[in-house]
């Protein structure tokens, strides 16, 4: 199987039609780190897009054993922990959407989650062993080697919590309570804040404890806002709307706007909700912000840039939201230009 452009540093667009099996082979065995990572991203993307088609046809996605074997080879091989974490991180929904002609965000979310759970189930034992093996060796130190260990350990925790397991959720809570650094605590919070069903109370408790500990650190509070705005749980829009009235949020503070509102605009599942509620909410926020800070409002309006990539019903809702912004009395030129370009 050819590994192309090895050690090549210049940006190159090269179209090579690898098969699924060839991509899995490169992910498992390529000695060029970038090519190995890219093979994984292409393989994961191909499988998720195929699953989208299956789900749209009412079928249950099937996942090949080859992707599990390749991921296991990466996970248990000798290598840089930071690279292993990077290689096994699935492409995000926004990246995947760019590779599709028409996007159904809900189906895309199901497909990506399905692959994550397939990997988590098939590699559960390996994830547990690595999580334990990379436990902190001592007090927190901001050095590169330990940062890589933390990153891989937190990836293992995230994968384990794709499974419906109280034991894995307890592991996240244990890490949250015992962490001596914000990185590990926030990684655990990200897991707990996305805990579904009856375990949502655990996430609420962790969010409250995190805010109480870090409320005087502005940049950490930004992360606290963002983790809620990026949630995949039902009710995320209502939570974000409520947070606009929280004392931690300030419509006059660009960092708070980016943390909460722009993050919500990047939340593929909830911003692009099929009923248009996410579009209407953000349009109202942009209109309110325009009279305070037109430049920031215009950046927020860029969340609508790719509305024409979605299905016709979502396009209808997005167009209506953009029109509502354009019709605002006294609309700034900054926002008008972004909206006009999007509508054009």
Give the role of each language-model region.
Residues 1-344:
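Long, ordered, helix-rich scaffold segments
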């Amino acid at each position: 199987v050819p590994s192309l452009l090895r050690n090549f540093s210049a940006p190159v667009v090269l179209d090579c039609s690898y098969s699924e099996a060839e991509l899995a082979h490169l992910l498992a065995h390529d000695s060029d780190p970038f090519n190995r990572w890219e093979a994984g991203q292409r393989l994961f993307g191909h499988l998720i897009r195929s699953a989208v088609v299956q789900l749209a046809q009412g079928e249950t996605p099937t996942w090949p054993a080859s992707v599990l074997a390749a991921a296991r080879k990466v996970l248990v091989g000798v290598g840089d922990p930071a690279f292993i974490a990077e290689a096994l991180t699935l492409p995000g929904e926004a990246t995947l959407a760019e590779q599709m002609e028409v996007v159904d965000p809900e189906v895309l979310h199901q497909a990506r989650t399905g692959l994550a759970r397939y990997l988590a189930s098939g590699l559960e034992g390996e994830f547990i062993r690595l999580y334990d093996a990379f436990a902190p060796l001592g007090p927190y130190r901001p050095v590169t080697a330990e940062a890589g260990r933390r990153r891989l350990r937190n990836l293992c925790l995230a994968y384990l919590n794709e499974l419906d397991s109280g034991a894995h959720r307890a592991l996240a809570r244990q890490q949250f309570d015992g962490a001596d650094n914000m990185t590990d605590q926030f990684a655990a919070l990200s897991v707990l804040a996305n805990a579904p069903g009856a375990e949502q109370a655990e996430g609420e408790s962790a969010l409250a404890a995190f805010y109480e500990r870090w409320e005087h650190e502005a940049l950490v509070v930004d992360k606290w806002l963002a983790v809620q705005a990026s949630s995949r749980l039902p009710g995320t829009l209502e939570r974000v709307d409520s947070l606009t009235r929280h004392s931690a949020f300030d419509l006059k503070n660009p960092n708070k706007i980016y943390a909460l509102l722009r993050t919500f605009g990047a939340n593929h599942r909830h911003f692009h909700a099929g009923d248009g509620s996410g579009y209407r909410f953000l349009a109202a926020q942009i209109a309110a912000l325009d009279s305070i800070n037109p430049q920031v409002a215009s950046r927020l309006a860029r969340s609508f840039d790719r509305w024409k990539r979605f299905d016709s019903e979502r396009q209808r809702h997005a167009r209506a939201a953009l029109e509502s912004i354009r019709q605002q009395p006294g609309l700034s030129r900054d926002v008008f230009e972004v909206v006009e370009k999007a509508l054009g």
